[in-house]
């Protein structure tokens, strides 16, 4: 028997029937759920970013272990939530989240409820968000006919190879298929740090050469398309201009002819890439921007250069932070089958389509060193503009399979994002100042906009808006805002909205840590969403003739399913063991009391 008292008690599935059948009172059951976010919130699924309203039971979403290493959690349950209160949080770097008051976000002081946060707090942002946002695009880029044609050309037209691809769902793909993005990234890596080659017994293999710490990411993507890989460590000894060097690499190999045929069909280069020359595949060039980005992530992970920010002094002794990106370089055989001029145009197109500005690129004879085989080498050198927006766009592409490039570039991206947001804020203030010029004096404008008088004078003489003062050296900025794989983003503004019925989505995860990433911020789903709790407790103390109990929908899923509870909060009213009514969504105590008294008469 469940104990009686004046507060609303939480009960379980096992206690439910006894509670509603053996009570001589009217029974009100409050079904509640865990964390709640706006339906437009973006979650990281495997392997893409989608709105939370796409989540369903069994979905896999990005989570972490206790050391903040990536892992995936399964969704145990999901519910629609209606609340009469919504909290919007905006950060200094332009991130935004809308949630219920009790929702937990990770801050520099641990997990804190949304309604307890202030602009003194910073929220944890997860840096490694290189997952694609896939837009609807039903255009086919890979067909059975193309694969069969490639197999016949390679004298590999055996039915079992085609069947292997068919079993893995790789014979017919559209641009909006998740596998398309994984293949685009792997192909990018294959063209730079990989190979399609012949092995013993006439077996073909696909190999990727990466650092040891990048192996897991390659294997994860190969598994997603249905292939297991072998791993072998190797030390390469070389010599350039009488200077010997050694390099440790890890070979990730898939000895499956079907995968060899697949990548050959997609534009992979068989044999020595230096002799053949690089070429961007047509399906990438003609594909949507999201596919091009996925390709560049793998391609730049192989041959791209990382962006770094350094603190330097000018001739006047002024200190400032500057972005540095070494030119991206490629070597072509002077008699290569594929034209270096065409490759430069193709690659430049992909970069510029991603918002990256290129300085004047050059194609010239490589004079720095001679090849052992005496073949003449052509050097393509592509310098990248390092202004705020171009540098930010470059780092926003992301590097897959290259942690040594990915981490410094993503840290730089956070810094650039902050400076860009501050610059945009100053531009808006400049526009406001110009509009106020004829109505107020300069001091009033300065005080209203919180901008120095000298800056207002400069704006009125035609000067453009610049980043505000308050310079901090980049290394000090890193120490202030970055901890391991997490960058803390300071809260800029908190908006509390009330008086309407706001929709939310509740999701419960099955792993230990319960952490996840939404809108690039780190959240926790352990705190129950008890939005009706104060109202229910007040009514329980006031209406002694009614018994109030609470059910956690996620922990008692059979009961939620039995009563078809899909929207939270949901109050179900029982009389003599039978449901007589239900109240959906957040309601005031007066509304609920009036309805309950109707069943007491």
PLM segments and residue spans:
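Short active-site neighborhood of thiol/selenol oxidoreductases, capturing the structured segment around
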Residues: 23-34, 526
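Thiol-based oxidoreductase modules, predominantly thioredoxin-like and allied folds used
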Residues: 10-12, 31-34, 533-558
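Intein-associated homing endonuclease modules of the LAGLIDADG/DOD-type, together
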Residues: 63, 78-370, 487-525
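Non-catalytic, surface beta->alpha helical segment in thiol-disulfide oxidoreductase systems
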Residues: 573-601
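Short alpha-helical "recognition helix" segments of helix-turn-helix
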Residues: 441-449
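Short, amphipathic alpha-helical "recognition" segments used to contact nucleic acids or chromatin
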Residues: 420-440
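A short, hydrophobic beta-strand/beta-hairpin element that forms part of a small beta-sheet core
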Residues: 27-31, 536, 569-582
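A short beta-strand-turn-helix
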Residues: 9-27, 557
């Amino acid at each position: 028997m469940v104990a009686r008292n004046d507060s609303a008690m939480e009960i379980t599935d096992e206690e439910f029937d006894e509670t509603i059948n053996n009570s001589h009172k009217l029974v009100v059951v409050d079904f509640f759920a865990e964390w709640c976010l706006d339906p437009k919130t973006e979650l990281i699924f495997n392997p893409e970013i989608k709105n939370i309203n796409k989540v369903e039971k069994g979905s896999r979403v990005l989570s972490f272990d206790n050391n903040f290493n990536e892992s995936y959690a399964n969704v145990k349950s999901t519910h629609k939530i209606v609340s009469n209160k919504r909290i919007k949080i905006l950060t200094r770097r332009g991130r935004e989240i809308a949630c219920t008051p009790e929702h937990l976000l990770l801050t520099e002081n641990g997990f804190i409820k949304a309604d307890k946060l202030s602009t003194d707090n910073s929220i944890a942002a997860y840096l490694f968000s290189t997952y694609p946002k896939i837009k609807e695009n039903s255009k086919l880029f890979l067909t059975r006919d193309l694969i069969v044609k490639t197999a016949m050309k390679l004298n590999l037209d055996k039915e079992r190879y085609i069947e292997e691809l068919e079993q893995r769902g790789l014979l017919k793909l559209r641009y909006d298929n998740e596998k398309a993005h994984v293949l685009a990234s792997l192909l990018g890596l294959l063209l730079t740090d990989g190979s399609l080659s012949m092995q013993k017994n006439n077996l073909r293999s696909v190999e990727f050469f990466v650092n040891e710490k990048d192996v897991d990411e390659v294997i994860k993507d190969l598994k997603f398309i249905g292939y297991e890989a072998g791993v072998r460590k190797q030390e390469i000894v070389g010599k350039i201009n009488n200077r010997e060097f050694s390099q440790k690499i890890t070979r990730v190999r898939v000895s499956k002819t079907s995968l060899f045929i697949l990548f050959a069909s997609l534009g992979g280069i068989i044999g020595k890439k230096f002799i053949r020359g690089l070429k961007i595949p047509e399906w990438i060039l003609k594909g949507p921007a999201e596919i091009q980005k996925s390709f560049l992530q793998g391609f730049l992970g192989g041959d791209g250069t990382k962006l770094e920010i350094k603190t330097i002094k000018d001739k006047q002794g002024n200190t400032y932070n500057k972005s540095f990106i070494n030119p991206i370089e490629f070597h072509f055989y002077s008699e290569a089958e594929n034209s270096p001029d065409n490759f430069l145009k193709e690659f430049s197109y992909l970069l510029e389509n991603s918002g990256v500005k290129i300085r004047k690129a050059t194609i010239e004879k490589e004079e720095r060193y001679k090849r052992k085989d005496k073949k003449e080498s052509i050097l393509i050198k592509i310098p990248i503009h390092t202004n705020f927006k171009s540098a930010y766009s470059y780092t926003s592409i992301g590097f897959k399979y290259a942690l040594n490039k990915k981490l410094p570039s993503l840290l730089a991206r956070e810094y650039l994002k902050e400076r860009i947001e501050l610059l945009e804020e100053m531009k808006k203030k400049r526009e406001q100042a110009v509009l106020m010029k004829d109505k107020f004096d300069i001091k009033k404008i300065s005080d209203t906009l919180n901008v120095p008088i000298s800056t207002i004078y400069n704006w009125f003489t035609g000067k453009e808006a610049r980043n505000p003062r308050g310079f901090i050296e980049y290394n000090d900025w890193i120490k202030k805002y970055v901890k391991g794989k997490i960058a803390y983003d300071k809260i800029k503004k908190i908006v509390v909205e009330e008086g309407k019925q706001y929709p939310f989505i509740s999701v419960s995860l099955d792993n230990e840590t319960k952490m996840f990433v939404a809108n690039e911020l780190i959240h926790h789903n352990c705190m129950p969403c008890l939005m009706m709790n104060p109202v229910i407790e007040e009514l329980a103390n006031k209406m002694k003739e009614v018994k109030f109990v609470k059910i956690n929908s996620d922990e008692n899923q059979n009961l939620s399913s039995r009563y078809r509870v899909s929207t939270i909060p949901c109050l179900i009213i029982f009389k003599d063991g039978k449901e007589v009514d239900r109240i959906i969504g957040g309601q005031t105590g007066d509304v609920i009391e009036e309805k309950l008294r109707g069943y007491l008469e």
